[in-house]
């Protein structure tokens, strides 16, 4: 059993002496594999978060993205399309039999996506290990992200199998009900799980799920994440896929989990739910605000780059921030 678990709202980072005159001097860029990105943040590879249009926008503006895998037949044309424009191609695959054929087809057509994310709910499995090895054999140049996991053993096994990065988080997301349906996961202690996994990792970790505020991005970096995957904060923008509805004069957009019946079209092994999130305006505005908030975080950390956040002190305060303040 693990003692002293904590989650995002239980932690406050402690400021160090500021060395910049303006937060605009702080650099939020991060390198993952061979590419450098503007923010250590990636929108979740979910159907109500990303589509081709958003992927293109993100890639053109130097943000990392991962395309979802729920229209598998479109992936080849997507890779071609992105690469023909000089943009990176970053796709997701599952672990079923036809995904093995898909990887071989890419190799046969000499299509090498820059990033491939193997993305299943319980990533500590032979199925994922075999797929990592398969991709590394046929597409050795692709950067492989594997997940999702929640333990140091899993991180080490996937790294040893050849994963270039691992994705940590089992069920902490807002539209994920894994914790309720199964009793398992990192919901409620995602930040402690991230820290535990990061200590075992020798390659980058992507924290996935449970982010509710921009400050949580800084906290993720502090506890070892290279990149932070975010769903709900990216849901509900003008550009977001998904239907807009009006209720009592307010606009909302649908947001659903990848293992929900809305996603699957059937009620089998459902571990996701649907919710409506308030319409948030433009994606660009949110990305700019995230960058500015992270620049402020770096200045509070007493540095000019993201790495400064990794060494700050912190305190564990149960639910400090929420003493009556509604932040979302």
Swiss-Prot record:
Single GO term (MF): oxidoreductase activity, acting on the CH-CH group of donors
One GO CC annotation: GMP reductase complex
One GO BP: 'de novo' pyrimidine nucleobase biosynthetic process
Catalytic residues identified in the record: 176 (thioimidate intermediate)
Binding site for NADP(+): 205-228
Coiled-coil region(s): none
InterPro entries per the UniProt record, alphabetical: Aldolase_TIM, Dihydroorotate_DH_CS, GMP_reductase, GuaC_type_2, IMP_DH/GMP_Rdtase_CS, IMP_DH_GMPRt
Enzymatic class: oxidoreductase
EC number: 1.7.1.7
A Pfam match: IMPDH
Catalytic activity as recorded in UniProt: IMP + NH4(+) + NADP(+) = GMP + NADPH + 2 H(+)
Alphabetical keyword list: NADP, Oxidoreductase
Family note: Belongs to the IMPDH/GMPR family. GuaC type 2 subfamily.
HAMAP family cross-referenced by the UniProt entry: GMP_reduct_type2
Function: Catalyzes the irreversible NADPH-dependent deamination of GMP to IMP. It functions in the conversion of nucleobase, nucleoside and nucleotide derivatives of G to A nucleotides, and in maintaining the intracellular balance of A and G nucleotides.
Protein name as it appears in the record: GMP reductase
Organism name: Bacillus cereus (strain ATCC 14579 / DSM 31 / CCUG 7414 / JCM 2152 / NBRC 15305 / NCIMB 9373 / NCTC 2599 / NRRL B-3711)
């Amino acid at each position: 059993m693990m003692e002293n678990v904590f989650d995002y709202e239980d932690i406050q980072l402690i400021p160090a002496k500021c060395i910049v005159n303006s937060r605009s001097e702080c650099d939020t860029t991060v390198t993952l594999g061979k590419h450098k990105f503007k923010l250590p943040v990636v929108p979740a590879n979910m159907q109500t978060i990303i589509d081709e249009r958003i992927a293109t926008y993100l890639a053109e503006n130097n943000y990392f993205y991962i395309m979802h895998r729920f229209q598998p037949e479109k992936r080849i044309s997507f890779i071609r399309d992105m690469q023909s424009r000089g943009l990176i191609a970053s796709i997701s695959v599952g672990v079923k039999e036809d995904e093995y054929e898909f990887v071989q087809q890419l190799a046969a057509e000499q299509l090498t996506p820059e990033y491939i994310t193997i993305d299943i709910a319980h990533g500590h499995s032979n199925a994922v290990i075999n797929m990592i090895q398969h991709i590394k054999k046929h597409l050795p140049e692709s950067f492989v992200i594997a997940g999702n996991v929640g333990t140091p053993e899993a991180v080490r096994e996937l790294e040893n199998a050849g994963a270039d990065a691992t994705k940590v988080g089992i069920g902490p997301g807002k539209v994920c009900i894994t914790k309720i349906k199964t009793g398992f996961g990192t919901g409620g202690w995602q930040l402690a799980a991230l820290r535990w996994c990061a200590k075992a990792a020798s390659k980058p970790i992507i924290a996935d799920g449970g982010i509710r505020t921009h400050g949580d991005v800084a906290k993720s970096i502090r506890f070892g994440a290279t990149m932070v995957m975010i769903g709900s904060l990216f849901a509900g923008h003008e550009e977001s896929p998904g239907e807009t509805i009006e209720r009592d004069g307010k606009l909302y957009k649908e947001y659903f989990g990848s293992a929900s019946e809305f996603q699957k079209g059937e009620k089998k092994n459902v571990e996701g739910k649907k919710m409506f999130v308030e319409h948030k305006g433009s994606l660009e505005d949110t990305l700019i605000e995230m960058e500015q908030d992270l620049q402020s975080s770096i200045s509070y950390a007493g540095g000019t780059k993201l790495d400064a956040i990794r060494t700050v002190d912190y305190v564990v305060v149960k639910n400090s921030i929420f003493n009556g303040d509604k932040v979302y």
